[in-house]
């Protein structure tokens, strides 16, 4: 019995279709088991059905924010169920997720922001300070930052909420309050 040559083996592999989205493929392959656990983290279990829903919603949200096909989205996120939903959601939207190690320095992230040309960053709340530092060091301007599992409580100088207090007035201005505001 003879072993097929590399050329013969390659010729027998079917070509990819003209349009192929790996995230859509992965979600479709697992559509028949929506209740099965896909990922588990310290906050709980994410089923395949929930992964499908979260990835599609995140992808739609990224597109609604104005991100376009093949633009980069930096994923500076701790391990957890938000990570695969974000990775697949970006891919589902036709974006390019850029996965990075969470143990690096602000200088490393500044370099990655500049060289990946990321238009958005999905960041774990605990890593937001290092991202902010990286963005001040980078010449590349990120358009959108989305925080996963933001940290609380807020610093006294941060606004907790805004409300427009006068309806239908051209002079309406938002009024905000933070922890140290008297009211």
Positions of predicted regions on the chain:
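Conserved pre-ATP/AMP-binding loop-to-beta segment of ANL
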Residues: 35, 152, 168-183
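Helix N-cap/beta->alpha junction signal
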Residues: 77-79, 124-125, 181
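Aromatic/hydrophobic pocket-lining residues that form π-stacking "cages" and hydrophobic walls in ligand
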Residues: 26, 85-86, 131
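Structural core segment of the AMP-binding/adenylate-forming
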Residues: 64-65, 92-166, 176
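Conserved AMP-binding/adenylate-forming core of the ANL superfamily
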Residues: 37-80, 84-88, 105-110, 162-163
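AMP-dependent adenylate-forming
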Residues: 24-50, 153, 182
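Flexible, non-catalytic linker and terminal segments flanking ANL/adenylate-forming cores
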Residues: 1-20
């Amino acid at each position: 019995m003879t072993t097929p040559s590399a050329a013969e083996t390659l010729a027998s592999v079917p070509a990819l279709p003209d349009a192929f989205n790996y995230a859509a493929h992965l979600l479709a392959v697992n559509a028949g088991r929506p209740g099965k656990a896909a990922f588990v983290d310290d906050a709980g279990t994410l089923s395949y059905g929930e992964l499908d829903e979260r990835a599609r919603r995140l992808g739609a949200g990224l597109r609604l924010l104005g991100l376009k096909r093949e633009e980069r989205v930096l994923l500076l996120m701790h391990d957890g169920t938000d990570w695969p939903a974000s990775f697949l959601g970006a891919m589902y939207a036709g974006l390019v997720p850029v996965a990075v190690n969470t143990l690096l320095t602000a200088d490393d992230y500044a370099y990655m922001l500049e060289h990946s040309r990321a238009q958005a960053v999905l960041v774990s709340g605990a890593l937001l300070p290092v991202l902010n530092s990286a963005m001040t060091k980078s010449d590349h301007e990120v358009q959108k930052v989305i925080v996963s599992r933001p940290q609380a409580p807020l610093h006294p100088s941060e606004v907790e909420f805004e409300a427009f207090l006068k309806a239908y007035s051209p002079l309406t201005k938002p009024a905000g309050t933070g922890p140290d505001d008297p009211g």
